[in-house]
Amino acid sequence: EIIKCDWSSDVCSSDLRWISAQLSSITGPIYAVGTGGNIAKLYNISGQVDETKTMEISELRKVSAYVKSFTYEERVNKLRLNTDRADVIVPAASIYLAAMECAQCPSIFVPDLGLKDGIIQLLYDRYLQRKKSSN
């Protein structure tokens, strides 16, 4: 699938330009990693059961359009989203899609751990290493 950057998206064009500018220094494939509640919820709504926890950009487009087709109230009542999530999930999907399109990234990895959890795990692992080496 050919992925093109949509400069007319709702995402700030300066952010998209920054992403595009970074591409010249990257060789090889580009991978997207999404953390947090919005991408996790989009992944769950997609109904995918995938051991790799990845979602193709085409699937993200579909689930984004699906969620966007509901009103705020329907997102809360029919999709069972929390009120704070129902309010921001559509713009969040637009941001993920715009960033992936500009980076020409075909899929996004949706880990079970959030960014905060991953940083805490990393710090704890480093602490254990220091403690181990000091004994």
Could you tell me what each predicted segment is?
Residues E1-V11:
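Single conserved hydrophobic/aromatic residue that forms the stacking wall/gate
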Residues W18-Y31:
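Phosphate/pyrophosphate-binding loops at sites that engage ATP/ADP/AMP, CoA/4′-phosphopantetheine
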Residues I39-Y43, K116-D117:
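Short, active-site-adjacent cap segments at secondary-structure transitions
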